[in-house]
Amino acid sequence: MRLSKEFIGLGIITASLIFGSSLPDIYKGIVILIVAGCLWFFELLPLPVTSLAIPIMAVFLGIFNLKEALTYFAHPIIFLFLGGFMLAQALKNHNLDKFIAYKLLNYGKDFKTTCFLMFLSAYFLSMWISNTSATLILLPIALGLLHKKTGKLRDFLLLGVAYSASIGGIATIIGSPPNAIASSYLDYGFFSWFKVGFPISLLLFLICTLTLYIYFKKWIPKEDIAIQARMELSRNAYKLLVIFVLIASLWIISDYLSEIFNVQYFDSVIAIFAIILLFVFNLVEVNDFKKIDWGTLILFGGALCLGGVIVKSGANTFLSEKLIAILGNLTPIVLLFLVVTITIILTNFISNTGLTGIIVPILFGVSLGIPKEILILAVGMSASCSFILPVGTPPNAIVYSEGVKKEEMMKIGMILSILSAAVITLYSILYL
């Protein structure tokens, strides 16, 4: 009888508990790291389920007690994401996300300009809502603009939307879970991340757009075309717009507010305040909590817990020493480029949240002639650069399902991956 992959995953977890119980703590941490990495990579269990298995393994192997293990699932940054998800749900409920996209697209004069504005819409929306939602919002508009056209033009427009949505997530701490994982090790707030994340995301967005235009130049029509879409906002939508601007403004100055009120993770306080405001003004309902992406929050908590396991068991120090022995002779810029490149390659095969949760704790304990802050920020930013495969990220999968050729995605994706690795490396060395 053929075993299902879920039973194989369960068997691996059980075996790790049986054979790992007699090992020293360092090796217990490495066992949990390997098991979690394998389960995430091969998706033997759903990603959130693997994340829930991490604290259980940590408890049974004696690294944490249950209270310590589950604390990571109530980390303040989890609540920052919860607030961001609820704000995104409110935008969806009242069509404010579509309104923002349509407003931008109305400025298009010809096909080229309209496409750029569509990419810009995906980039901007992805700072505040998931890259999946940003792609799905713009997909019907993009398909309508194509008028059943196929081939290179379809690849150009749809890949531009998908890649822009992924890159936009780098800009803010709530844009992508890897940002928050990296921030949790650096005690970064919303504005601290925005200061470093927005410039590199904007640069990558412009490079991505330029690369797509150059690659597909001869297939882009020159005829005039414009989207004249009108949307009327409801009274509640205007209320939401005010709250959205207020919360975004508070997040931007959250580091200063944290100092004034002497409260750590003040951006998480703002996120909780945002949820309360949304309910007070009847912009969301209790049922909207059911629509939140709880799987991502659990995955995020599991990644944080894995990081805690690696640090407490001493596995990060052990692995760091091995890393130094292998890479210690490389120059800092070559080493940084190598770390960024490996992250970008792996993020095409494994969840970027899980990947960041594995790499960051190891780098946190290493000394390779590069400040830890630069290494961790570079990994956090690189984890969102998944351009090569349809399975790499939901936006890639969405546009692939709409007819984008895998060969074109791989060609453009490889070019963008190389450019992204070089740009992030130089940015990290020169700017950070």
Swiss-Prot record:
GO terms for cellular component: plasma membrane. Keywords: Cell membrane, Membrane, Transmembrane, Transmembrane helix, Transport. It is found in: Cell membrane. Disulfide bonds: none annotated. The keyword Lipid metabolism does not apply. It is a multi-pass membrane protein. The keyword Cell membrane applies. GO terms for biological process: transmembrane transport. The chain crosses the membrane at residues 7-27, 29-49, 68-88, 124-144, 156-176, 196-216, 241-261, 266-286, 291-311, 326-346, 358-378, 379-399, 412-432. InterPro entries: Cit_transptr-like_dom, Na/sul_symport_CS, SLC13A/DASS. PROSITE patterns: NA_SULFATE. GO terms for molecular function: succinate transmembrane transporter activity; transmembrane transporter activity. PANTHER family: SOLUTE CARRIER FAMILY 13 MEMBER, SOLUTE CARRIER FAMILY 13 MEMBER 2. Belongs to the CitM (TC 2.A.11) transporter family. This is Uncharacterized transporter MJ0672. It comes from Methanocaldococcus jannaschii (strain ATCC 43067 / DSM 2661 / JAL-1 / JCM 10045 / NBRC 100440) (Methanococcus jannaschii).
